[in-house]
Amino acid sequence: MSHNDTIVAQATPPGRGGVGILRISGLKARGVAQEVLGKLPKPRYADYLPFKDVDGSALDQGIALWFPGPNSFTGEDVLELQGHGGPVILDLLLKRILTLPGVRIARPGEFSERAFLNDKLDLAQAEAIADLIDASSEQAARSALNSLQGAFSARVNHLVEALTHLRIYVEAAIDFPDEEIDFLSDGKIEAQLNGVIADLDAVRTEARQGSLLREGMKVVIAGRPNAGKSSLLNALAGREAAIVTDIAGTTRDVLREHIHIDGMPLHIIDTAGLRDANDEVERIGIERAWQEIEQADRVLFMVDGTTTDAVDPADIWPDFIARLPKNLPITVVRNKADITGETLGISEVNGHSLVRLSARTGEGVDVLRNNLKQSMGFETNMEGGFLARRRHLQALAEAANHLEQGKAQLLGAWAGELLAEELRLAQQSLSEITGEFTSDDLLGRIFSSFCIGK
């Protein structure tokens, strides 16, 4: 579709409400104002006016706001009509506007896309709009707002600028090889490169925090039947989310709870007890359990402390450990400490965290909560933090790889041309975050996930 079209969409959620807003952007927005309002409102002033139908009768009355381009969110002429929030009223007004030639319904995210294309915000800021709307916690909302205000983009742009200066220095060394000073081996380039690598590592650390805050961590509770998995889910969720009985195999399907631990979002998943089941329904539940385990960020290996004294997961259930995906983090949870009399707390066994608790009484559950938070490196207070998406992490990782490759070329062979190329590729990877180098397909995927009126 052409970006020269004038677009309209409801900017408020569907349904009944006190206020309903229609947003219009494009060349014909001025004509819409004159047709529907009978006048062009004073720029950036609220004007209380009737909204008129084709025959001049009033459809509604409310506030009209006129933002002539380029001083608007999209960079185009923008008109906002704020009327009553009834779906019938808004639908009538929308149909009235669509009778005007050259006006069409906006695609999802098209207002933000136009703002990006008109240099009103970069791609990371545009994504932050959707993240702010979807934020599931106060900290996520604050971090999304920081990204919208340019905190993440500023960090990325600083890295791009540093790489630009470094590339200039390297290119000079390549173009003037007969100078008395060997720029490639005088130590200055290596020092600057190490500085950029260190700055990039710091941004990657914050970005991982931001991604965790946005995406959440997927934690799967797994183990044999009657180990207390559902009781632990209830204890972590703070409510009776799962049915708990003494009957083995009570949980046959996957149960999900979304919780927060000091601002960190977690997707807690309770699964069917793992065993050789004869019942077809239970077998399906066990298959689903393994599917969830294979996609987990961490597994809580639930152990009934009354059935074994072993603490090493390989000794407790070697077949289970052997089937787990390689490098999948495990926390061993020895349950029923209220019965065994074990000392509550946390220790480490063969590189795995071991938590002793009672899911029934709740004793020791806070220790597990802290373990989950610390295991992901999550910081409760992230002043100035920003949200990040998986594509951001990938771009940062690619940039880091190019810088390490460039450093190897510099130290191994003093190969200036190869170093310059790696620096260029690193710069390009970083620029993908803000949208300076981004394919149209990626833009389409990003903005299509937005709300219609954003």
UniProtKB/Swiss-Prot annotation:
Mg(2+) binds at residues 230, 251. Its EC number is 3.6.-.-. PROSITE patterns: G_TRME. K(+) binds at residues 226, 245, 247, 250. InterPro entries: G_TrmE (IPR031168), GTP-bd (IPR006073), GTP-bd_TrmE_N (IPR018948), GTPase_MnmE (IPR004520), MnmE_dom2 (IPR027368), MnmE_helical (IPR025867), P-loop_NTPase (IPR027417), Small_GTP-bd (IPR005225). Keywords: Cytoplasm, GTP-binding, Hydrolase, Magnesium, Metal-binding, Nucleotide-binding, Potassium, tRNA processing. Binds 1 potassium ion per subunit. GO terms for molecular function: GTP binding; GTPase activity; metal ion binding. Homodimer. Heterotetramer of two MnmE and two MnmG subunits. Exhibits a very high intrinsic GTPase hydrolysis rate. Involved in the addition of a carboxymethylaminomethyl (cmnm) group at the wobble position (U34) of certain tRNAs, forming tRNA-cmnm(5)s(2)U34. This is tRNA modification GTPase MnmE. The gene is mnmE.
